[in-house]
């Protein structure tokens, strides 16, 4: 299994703030994510700006698409994204349309696993050609003290066995990494930890290598 990639999630409210973190951290990460909040505030220009700033990085448009998969995929990939997220609750037709456009554009679709979904859903996504999903604890779950548990790991292993590679996020610490040894991990996604590293670097502390 190849080394998991490191993804910087930019959940800023302004592009200027996001690009400051990118300047500090882009040499330490493999993937740069135009987060949902950033894209809602800054529009398609956020993806375009990050592509210009990071010509050699994988760019993710984290749009959590629920409909109009073909149209939005065309816009995302046309703006320079390599991957685009579709929410797990989207109709299978939306996933199919988005995936077909991704294939035409040389990109990939990631299924965002929020809320209710089943392994039968995952099999359907894999059957139509999708090979990536995102598994995470959301902000509210982390705030309530939810930890990575056996149920999470069992579901991730089941997804891996279906053939999906997972990007994992939700308050991961170095001590957590051994928990994922049997999982097909595509990437670990970091938000606040990497942002904190950027602030330390500004103060002269330096950014740890990814």
Please provide the spans of the model-predicted regions.
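Short, acidic/polar
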Residues: 13-25, 67-75, 116-124, 173-178
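Conserved N-terminal beta1-alpha1 strand-loop-helix module at the mouth
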Residues: 1-70, 202-210
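Alpha-helix-loop-beta-strand connector modules within alpha/beta enzyme cores
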Residues: 40-64, 98-115, 148-174, 206-210
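Alpha-helix termination/capping residues and helix-transition junctions
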Residues: 25-28, 53, 78, 127, ...
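Hydrophobic residues within beta-strands of alpha/beta enzymes
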Residues: 32, 84, 133, 188-189
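Conserved anion-binding
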Residues: 2-6, 68-163
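Active-site beta-loop-alpha junctions enriched in small/polar residues
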Residues: 9-13, 35-39, 64-68, 89, ...
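C-terminal helical cap(s) of enzyme catalytic domains, especially alpha/beta-barrels
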Residues: 98, 149, 181, 190-210
